[in-house]
């Protein structure tokens, strides 16, 4: 692998020239879905400028991890995550960090590839302070309870039909036009009894 180097203006111009005209698009997931489908979920600060690998056109951000919520076994003997990797072009779903506040903490949910943390623009990356208290409770403790049995089932158009008793119908985008609606900010899809999952409030579980 070629060494990473600071992302210079010339590289930015090159990426802009060769980038396809159509940008990457994806449907933001419910936070529980993001947690369950990720290999690693951490809280971290972005502390360095992006560096690009000129051969692979991947870039990496230096981060300082402050908390890990998922991935202890997947990470193995590695005690820390120092970098997060992403495609260098937004058109192929590369994540571009907009904040210049290096003291701000972010919730990062990503995939591990060869021991490296990878994210895209479709990954769940959000300022920790922007999460509701219920979402923080979900990431720190509760979402994991629903990962094995339960599935958040997106409803994007009418009619919506559940395919299983273990599915919870997610209607935020249909009813409110945003993935940041009530179900996303305050509820988790959790087992009620064997073979049945329901939306349950996270607010009532906050100590």
UniProtKB/Swiss-Prot annotation:
Disulfide bond sites? 24-93, 26-122, 36-147, 150-197, 155-160, 168-189
Q: Name one Pfam family in it.
A: TIMP
The cellular component terms of Gene Ontology attached to this UniProt record, alphabetical and capped at eight, are: basement membrane; endoplasmic reticulum lumen; extracellular exosome; extracellular matrix; extracellular region; extracellular space; platelet alpha granule lumen
In chain numbering, the residues marked as site (Involved in metalloproteinase-binding) are 57, 158
> Which domain of life does the protein's organism represent?
Eukaryota
Which Gene3D superfamilies has this protein been placed in?
2.40.50.120, Tissue inhibitor of metalloproteinase-1. Chain B, domain 1 (3.90.370.10)
User: Where in the numbering of this chain does the NTR domain appear?
Assistant: 24-147
InterPro entries per the UniProt record, alphabetical? Netrin_domain, TIMP, TIMP-like_OB-fold, TIMP_C, TIMP_CS
User: Which residues are annotated as modified residue Phosphoserine in the UniProt record?
Assistant: 178
MF terms from GO for this chain are: cytokine activity; growth factor activity; metalloendopeptidase inhibitor activity; peptidase inhibitor activity; protease binding; zinc ion binding
**Binding residue positions for Zn(2+):** 24
PANTHER family xref list? METALLOPROTEASE INHIBITOR, METALLOPROTEINASE INHIBITOR 1
Job of this protein: Metalloproteinase inhibitor that functions by forming one to one complexes with target metalloproteinases, such as collagenases, and irreversibly inactivates them by binding to their catalytic zinc cofactor. Acts on MMP1, MMP2, MMP3, MMP7, MMP8, MMP9, MMP10, MMP11, MMP12, MMP13 and MMP16. Does not act on MMP14. Also functions as a growth factor that regulates cell differentiation, migration and cell death and activates cellular signaling cascades via CD63 and ITGB1. Plays a role in integrin signaling.
Please give the subunit comment from the record: Interacts with MMP1, MMP3, MMP10 and MMP13, but has only very low affinity for MMP14. Interacts with CD63; identified in a complex with CD63 and ITGB1.
From the Swiss-Prot or TrEMBL record, give the protein name. Metalloproteinase inhibitor 1
Q: Which organism is it from?
A: Homo sapiens
Q: Which gene encodes it?
A: TIMP1
């Amino acid at each position: 692998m070629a060494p990473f180097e600071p992302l210079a203006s010339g590289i930015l111009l090159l990426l802009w020239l060769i980038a396809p005209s159509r940008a990457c698009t994806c449907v933001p997931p419910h936070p529980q879905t993001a947690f369950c489908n990720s290999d690693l979920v951490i809280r971290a600060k972005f502390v360095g400028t992006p560096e690009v690998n000129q051969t692979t056109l991947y870039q990496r951000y230096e981060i300082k991890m402050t908390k890990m919520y998922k991935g202890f076994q997947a990470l193995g003997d590695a005690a820390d995550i120092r970098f997060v990797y992403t495609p260098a072009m937004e058109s192929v779903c590369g994540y571009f960090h907009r904040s210049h506040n290096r003291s701000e903490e972010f919730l990062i949910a990503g995939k591990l590839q060869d021991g490296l943390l990878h994210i895209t623009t479709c990954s769940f990356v959000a300022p920790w302070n922007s999460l509701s208290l219920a979402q923080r409770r979900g990431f720190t403790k509760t979402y994991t309870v629903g990962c094995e049995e339960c599935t958040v089932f997106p409803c994007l158009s009418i009619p919506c039909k559940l395919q299983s008793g273990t599915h919870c119908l997610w209607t935020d985008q249909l009813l409110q036009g945003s993935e940041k609606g009530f179900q996303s900010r305050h509820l988790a899809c959790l087992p009620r009894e064997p073979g049945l999952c329901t939306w349950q409030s996270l607010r009532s579980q906050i100590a």
